[in-house]
């Protein structure tokens, strides 16, 4: 807890989100912009709001987010993870329901590296019999 703000760090792929929440009327600001202006896809907006809707805190908190790295989906996942951790910092009794929904665990999937002699991580050159 920093002042009257609760804090949570979220990560997904190469995106890192620093999330600050405090009691308010439901405003979500991401990198200085309203959330609807920052995330263009409806699915990204849905992903970010999932922990708030699960805990019935949709209009309870003002949320300020700094996020960098990654693409839109990775950033949305990082913000969701950060909001989850900030909610747990605010009220530890929310952890079991958030954990059952799978929001507490960091999604550890990362991009697999490209291997020498292959086109991509696993895609080999086309094989020709003759």
Curated annotation (Swiss-Prot):
InterPro entries per record: Ribosomal_Su5_D2-typ_SF, Ribosomal_uS9, Ribosomal_uS9_bac/plastid, Ribosomal_uS9_CS, Ribsml_uS5_D2-typ_fold_subgr
GO terms of molecular function: RNA binding; structural constituent of ribosome
Transport as UniProt keyword: no
GO cellular component, one term: cytosolic small ribosomal subunit
Keyword field contains Ribosomal protein: yes
Pfam families according to UniProt: Ribosomal_S9
Gene3D superfamilies: 3.30.230.10
GO biological process, any: translation
Keyword annotations from UniProtKB, A to Z: Ribonucleoprotein, Ribosomal protein
Cleavable signal peptide: none
Protein family: Belongs to the universal ribosomal protein uS9 family.
Protein name in UniProt: Small ribosomal subunit protein uS9
């Amino acid at each position: 807890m920093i002042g009257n703000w609760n804090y949570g760090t979220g990560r997904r792929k190469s995106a890192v989100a620093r999330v600050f929440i405090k009691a308010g009327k439901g405003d979500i600001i991401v990198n200085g912009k309203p959330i609807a202006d920052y995330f263009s896809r409806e699915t990204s907006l849905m992903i970010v709001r999932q922990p708030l809707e699960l805990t019935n805190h949709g209009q309870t908190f003002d949320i300020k987010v700094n996020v960098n790295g990654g693409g839109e989906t990775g950033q949305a996942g990082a913000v969701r993870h950060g909001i989850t951790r900030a909610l747990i910092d605010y009220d530890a009794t929310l952890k079991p329901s958030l954990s059952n929904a799978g929001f507490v665990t960091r999604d550890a999937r990362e991009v697999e590296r490209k291997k020498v002699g292959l086109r991509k991580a696993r895609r080999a050159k086309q094989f020709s019999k003759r």
